[in-house]
C-alpha cells in the first residue's frame, strides 16, 4: 500500500515441486510519529490475505504487524486469508518492547496454511532490537488428515476487508 514500506513476497519450491509462498511484512504502525490511523497497516495485511485466498496458496506470513492477535484487523486477516495463527495454544509471545519488562505486547506474528504443523516455537533472548526474535520450526504435511480447521470470512467480512483496503490505499496516497 505504501511505496516506501518494504514487504517481501518470495516463493519456496520444495523437492517435490510444490510451491510455498512466503510473505514478510512490516506495515506502518498507527502512532503520532508514523500514521494517524491504522488504515494503511490494515490495508497491507488484508491485501496479502485476499491474495493468498484468491490464489489458493500454501503460505507462511511473518512479520512485525504492529497489531495484537486479538484486534479486529488481525482476526479479519485470519478469516480472509484462511491461515492459522501459530501462537494459538502455544502462548502469547510478547515480543515488543524488549527493553521494558512490564510493558510488552505480542506484535510479531507467524501465520501458516493448515498444511503446516508447528513442531517448535519459542521467543528467543534479547538481540539488541526493540523486539525479541521468534523461532519456529514447521513440518509440511499436505495430507488431508493433518490439516487444521480454519476460520473463513463470510460475505460481510469480505466486503469489510475490501472497504478497509480502499480506505488504506486512499490514505497512503
Which residues are covered by each model-predicted region?
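Soluble catalytic domains of enzymes that build or remodel membrane lipids, polysaccharides, and related
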Residues: 1-172
